[in-house]
Amino acid sequence: MKQLIVLIACVIQGEAGGLGEIGMFMVADTMAYRYETSQNWDDVLKYYYGYNSEPSDFATSLATRLVTDPWKSFFQCPFAYSDQDRYTQKWPVGNYTYKSLHLKQSWPGK
């Protein structure tokens, strides 16, 4: 379980560490939503990058909660993407946006 927590914390940090605690929570919330539907962390994590980041204490606390006592997703969005992805892929603005992070309830591609 500890290894899984560290892995998830690395991903949270890598995906949104530059956006601070709010951004990290939003990415973790997409993981919570995906876990609600799959109940399998391998299925959840295959959609994320950022595995090589050193996790912060906050990312680790989010990961610990996701593994030991997952919350019901607040945003109900399985997709998270950046402004850069939005521009290069010509995707729409997300249902929820924070700084350069977009959360979307449906696949943003065509």
Describe these PLM feature segments.
Residues 4-110:
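Bacterial extracytoplasmic/cell-wall-associated proteins, especially those involved in peptidoglycan
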